[in-house]
């Protein structure tokens, strides 16, 4: 893991990575739209139900939620700075979130499809989300502790 000593670099790096997931979701949305217009791709993997599930799931779990989850950290960083240990946990949260997104896309493309519009990925992937959530809570705790140091010296 690279040295994380600058919060701005962390956010910029992850913004660029997250844009790739946004573009992927947009791609699957366009493929689904083309299917709705009547141009059919004769593929078992790229069928309309899979495309819809991937597009909606990437919009619900991809770029926007991940960037919004950084908002408390951005506000704390603006007021009192950042905690290196908290940034390390935030990085772990982000890594597990990316792993979840990759497995979710693969699961929706190649796995059994129940025909749901979203949340059609394997339930076992919820473990990755829960683990990411633990790291998020720890990172938030480390960042919030900065207020105590800032206010009381």
Positions of the model-derived regions?
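Hydrophobic alpha-helical transmembrane segments of multi-pass integral membrane proteins
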Residues: 1-153
